[in-house]
């Protein structure tokens, strides 16, 4: 039985690799992501072609002092565009655009408006044939996705398991022990 640390605990590629959360350009300014990471393929050191940004947003209709209110989905599209342009020189050089990694910007909305509570929406690029029946392979244009996860309960929407899990995990109405118990009993999740 080996006792060398490299033999007993061999290197395993991480499934998730954290990235720098600051994206700074001279002409476009700075974007500070809450969390950004690359997803890795299981059982290999190769990266999956996914870059994921995760944002926790308290205000569902944020206000910019100069310009007034804006929509989170539009900010998510901008974040995706920045994550794509930041790949030049890293994921691809010159005109090797086929090497662009798909990006996701996922927004966990803590206090959405009442009608948005419990909603899970996804926004992405889609092909529309305006004339003719030619089709491009989806992998060539499916490069960005914005997802809004709106917490809270809504009697008009059947609660998804993900929203139920996040509602419990992030609840400010439950004690730590109550959260632990509910997460384990309802979702089989053991919090440490």
PLM features per residue range, with description:
Residues 1-192:
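Elongated, amphipathic alpha-helical interaction scaffolds
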